[in-house]
Each structure stands twice: as structure tokens, then as C-alpha cells.
Amino acid sequence: MKHALRALRWATIILWILLVFLVITLVYSAFNVGIDVGEPQLFIGDNRIIWAIPARINNSGLYGIYDLNITTVVEDADGEILLKSSSFVSLVPKQETHQIWHNISISLEKIPNYQAYLTNDTNFIINHSIRLNFGKAVPCSFIFNSTIPWGAPLYNLHIGDPSCQFNATHCIVFLNVSFENHSPYINLNGTLKVEVLNQNEEKIGMNSFPINVPPYQGNGNYPAYNETLSIPVDVSKLTYSGKIRLTFQTSMFSYETEVPYELKEIF
């Protein structure tokens, strides 16, 4: 009986020694893991913006890092989730360094209520979370956030009151359109289609115009568009009131808006 108790006592002591050793080495390993996040690189695709963020994981600890997950959630100023992106690494062995690219891809037309961000500047909140597991024994997580400004590509969009010039069969509607491109990412290269509809919703005139406004370069001078557009209209279908529909079409987005018109006299 005494031998059994002595063996149990030694087994308990050894178990506690191993447990303390494990805790010490795990803490040591945790403090010897370095995660360096580099400067994001920007890529513009046909219909999306991609931020590629380089991350370097230096595991100088005594255990492998398992199930490394980097997740980024982008929210608007009201806390609504706009998009989510994750990167996963199954193993970073001990005493090794691993390089990954964490990509955040934005397709404007897939963002909820994206058209509001085409004409209004705002701030986006970027929430990052990093989760990992030391030696398949101790899970850890790190959470941090940042804020980035969003510049609207059609900021301060202004559509002036239309005016008309008449002849025997047609009239020409003149319409001034202006805006500023506050986006450092989006090159506004596309078309602006203008349609004139009478009060019966009949299309009585249409014209298309090229637009080419470069992205904002950060020098305080916003690239601007300010043009007076001309649209031929069929006089026989012209009514005293109606509306003018404008459609911006680019590789990054499409945006449609309407303004009413009202004439004091037709002839």
C-alpha cells in the first residue's frame, strides 16, 4: 500500500511538472510569434477593387501554429456589414516563417445600398480578427480595427434645370451635369445616357455622352466633370411636364437617377 501511495505521489508531481513546463513553453511560444502586416496593394479589376494585404507570420516558438485564420469584416458608419473576407493557413511549423496574401475584394454592385456610396463620402470600419491554435492545445485570438475614408466617385452630383431651343420639328434640350470624383480607386471611364420622357412615360429624346474623369490623387484638387449636354427631342410628343433620366455606365458600376422637367410654354 505504501509503495502504491508513493508511486501515486510521484506520478502527481511529475504530472504537475509537465503541466507547468507545458504552460511555460506555450507562453514562451506565444510571445515569440510575430505577425507583421505590410502595406496593402491595390488592384483594379473589370468590376471590382482588390486590396491585397501581405502578412508575414514568424513562428519562433516551440510549437507549430495550427488553423491560422485571418478574417476581415467591412462595416459602414451605422454598423451594417458590407463584406467579409477570410484567409486560412493550416500549419506554420515551429521555427519557420510563412508569407500569405490576405485579399479583400469589393464589387460595388454587391454591396447593400451601394448607390448611396456613389454620391456620398463616408468612413468604413475595418474589423480584423486573427485566430490560431498553439500545438493543437491552446487557442488564441486577436481582434483589432481601423477606419478608412471612402470617397464618392459622383460626389455632389448636380443636375441643372433644363432649357430648350425650338425649330419646326424638333427642340434641343440643354442640361448641365456636374460632379467631382473623390475616389482614389475608381477611374470614371464610361458613358452617360440621357433620356427625355414626357408625362405619358414615352421616350421622346435620347443621347449618349462619353465620360472620363480620373481618380483623385490626394493633392486636394478633385477631378471634376462639368458639361452642358444637348438632347434632341420630338416636338410632336413633347408635353409641358415630364422627366429626364440619367444613366451612368462604367466597368465598376451603373447608376440611374431622374429629375423632373416643367416647361412654361411649348411653342
State each model region's role:
Residues 47-64, 169-184:
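Short beta-strand elements of extracellular/lumenal beta-sandwich folds
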Residues 107-154, 222-225, 231-267:
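Terminal connector regions
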Residues 79-115, 202-235:
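Intrinsically disordered, low-complexity Pro/Gly/Ser/Thr-rich segments with frequent PxxP/GP/PP motifs
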Residues 62-67, 81-82, 182-189, 204:
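Short acidic/proline- and small/hydrophobic-mixed sequence motifs that coincide with surface turns
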Residues 1-35, 177:
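Secretory targeting signatures
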Residues 155-202:
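Surface-exposed interaction/gating patches
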Residues 22-49, 143-170:
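Low-complexity, acidic Ser/Thr/Pro/Gly-rich terminal tails and inter-domain linkers that flank the onset
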